[in-house]
């Protein structure tokens, strides 16, 4: 592979302060908001939530008592049809709907909360921590890759992945990888890896960002 084609060119960019999701979300999921495990109070897109409220509450009631101290532990995720709840904290589930949609639909949904997809520049900065090395761990592959890549911003970036993360531009920034990719395919672990073509939303993921503006 010609590295000049497989990697984005080196450049200098002014990076604004940002809020960014620690974990990436599957691209075929629309995040509606989050619900408290103790009070059942939902915060987020109430118009979209109203249609699935009964199913969400049924999922939580099936899980157990309202008393958090009575729980042996909340499941990491709960699913019913196209509804998915993910444990977001000790007291909240993130509420999502599994969708068959286009990237433009996802971008529109994110804008409801003031979020968007990162640009290519922002993605590379967030994934690399501002470092210029080829990989997050340096310029050479270790004999055994960790389960997650190191990240100075505390982002959760798994080595094993079904696809890459979406960015604002129509460029693929990674690809499907096993837990221990070969030296040839491991180039897709680089924050600066790129390939042409639209991403497959059924296997891709996305990380919400919001630019912080200081007046």
Regions found by a protein language model. Give the residues of each.
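A detector for short metal-coordination/catalytic motifs
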Residues: 178-213
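Glycine-rich loops and low-complexity Gly/Arg-rich segments
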Residues: 10, 43-48, 141-144, 189-192
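Extended beta-strand/loop cores of jelly-roll/beta-sandwich
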Residues: 1-116, 200-215
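Glutamate identity and glutamate-enriched acidic tracts
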Residues: 12, 29-30, 124, 165, ...
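Functional-site microenvironments in short loops/helix caps that host divalent-cation chemistry
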Residues: 79-188
């Amino acid at each position: 592979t010609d590295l000049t084609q497989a990697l984005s060119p080196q450049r200098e960019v002014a990076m604004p302060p940002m809020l960014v999701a620690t974990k990436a979300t599957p691209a075929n999921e629309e995040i509606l908001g989050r619900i408290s495990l103790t009070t059942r109070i939902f915060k987020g897109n109430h118009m979209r939530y109203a249609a699935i409220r009964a199913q969400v509450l049924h999922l939580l009631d099936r899980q157990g008592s309202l008393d958090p101290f009575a729980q042996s532990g909340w499941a990491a995720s709960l699913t019913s049809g196209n509804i998915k709840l993910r444990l977001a904290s000790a007291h909240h589930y993130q509420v999502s709907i599994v969708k068959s949609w286009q990237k433009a639909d996802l971008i529109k949904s994110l804008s409801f909360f003031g979020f968007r997809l990162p640009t290519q520049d922002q993605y590379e900065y967030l994934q690399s921590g501002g470092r210029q090395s080829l990989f997050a761990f340096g310029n050479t592959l270790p004999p055994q890759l960790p389960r997650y890549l190191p990240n100075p911003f505390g982002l959760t970036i798994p080595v094993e992945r079904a696809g890459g993360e979406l960015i604002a531009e129509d460029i693929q920034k990674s690809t499907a990888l096993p837990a221990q990719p070969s030296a040839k395919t491991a180039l897709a672990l680089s924050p600066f890896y790129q390939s042409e073509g639209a991403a497959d939303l059924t296997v891709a993921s996305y990380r919400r960002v919001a630019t912080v503006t200081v007046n």
